[in-house]
């Protein structure tokens, strides 16, 4: 089995990744279940985002784990479009790098998102990176004060910060989207194979490597990881952890 916990549909700069593109990738690679959010959300186009997720649901059925991407502007009222839809959401997502002055760990906006995650009983995915606004360690207090919520640190960056968070917060996971193989293996060897989720950010890599075949890219990274860890750890990362996180 293979579960990809970090995939995108929608508009990304000059590229548009349609629901059909995502389904084609999933079938060609052999992804059994996939957690998908829409990058069209960057344009605050709620109607389009819902349309994309609905179309994906029609194409993938129960294979789809819909991720609700929440923006600060959306919290002011438009989030009702998502909450009142007939979509059974599997995960929430926020992107502090895109809204540097809004997603403060102790702020009211994060508190509201936490309340939604708690009400829906689903995990919260947070984009992390090397910038101060979204470092993994920035959210330790948030995770510690909400032990009943499962947090996914997308990308798990900076790497040293992510390891520190995993060591201090039992409700924290990281995903491997845009994470190099060496860092993935180090997480496993450090004893956190049960807290790493397979995620690829597909089809975003095609923006940075437009000439590369994405199916080959995907299969190559998956094969390299499989060769680098035990079969038990490989299965833990590629589907067993996700089954726990998404309550499958």
What do the predicted segments below correspond to?
Residues 6, 26, 53, 92, ...:
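Conserved, mostly hydrophobic/aromatic
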Residues 3-7, 34-36, 64-68, 90-94, ...:
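Hydrophobic faces of well-ordered beta-strands that scaffold small-molecule active sites
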Residues 1-5, 16-33, 118, 211-248:
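Mid-to-C-terminal alpha-helical segments outside catalytic/metal-binding sites
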Residues 5-8, 14, 20-44, 63-71, ...:
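Divalent metal-dependent hydrolysis catalytic cores, especially in the metallo-beta-lactamase
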Residues 11-17, 40-48, 70-78, 99-106, ...:
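Acidic-and-aromatic substrate-binding clefts and catalytic sites of carbohydrate-active enzymes
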Residues 42-46, 104, 206-216:
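Short, flexible/disordered intra-domain loops and linkers
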Residues 48-124, 170-173, 187:
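Active-site gating/metal-coordination segments in enzymes
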Residues 104-198:
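Catalytic pocket-lining loop regions of alpha/beta-barrel enzymes
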């Amino acid at each position: 089995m293979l579960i990809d916990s970090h995939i995108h549909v929608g508009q990304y700069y000059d590229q548009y990744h349609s629901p059909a593109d995502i389904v084609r990738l999933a079938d060609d690679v052999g992804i059994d279940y996939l957690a998908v959010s829409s990058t069209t959300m960057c344009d605050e186009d709620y109607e389009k985002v819902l349309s994309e997720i609905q179309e994906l649901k029609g194409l993938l059925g129960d294979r789809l784990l819909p991720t609700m991407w929440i923006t600060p502007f959306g919290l002011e009222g438009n989030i009702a479009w998502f909450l009142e839809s007939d979509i059974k959401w599997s995960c929430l997502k926020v992107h502090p790098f895109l809204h540097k002055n809004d997603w403060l760990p102790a702020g009211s906006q994060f508190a509201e998102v936490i309340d939604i995650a708690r009400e829906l009983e689903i995990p919260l995915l947070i984009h992390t990176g090397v910038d101060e606004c979204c470092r993994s360690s920035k959210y330790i207090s948030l995770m510690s004060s909400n032990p009943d919520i499962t947090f996914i640190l997308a990308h798990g960056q900076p790497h040293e910060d992510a390891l520190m968070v995993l060591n201090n917060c039992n409700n924290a996971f990281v995903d491997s989207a845009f994470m190099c193989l060496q860092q993935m293996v180090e997480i496993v060897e450090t004893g956190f194979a049960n807290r790493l989720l397979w995620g690829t950010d597909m089809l975003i890599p095609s923006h940075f490597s437009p000439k590369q075949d994405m199916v080959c890219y995907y299969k190559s990274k998956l094969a390299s990881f499989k060769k680098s860890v035990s079969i038990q750890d490989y299965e833990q990362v590629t589907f067993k952890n996700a089954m726990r996180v998404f309550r499958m």
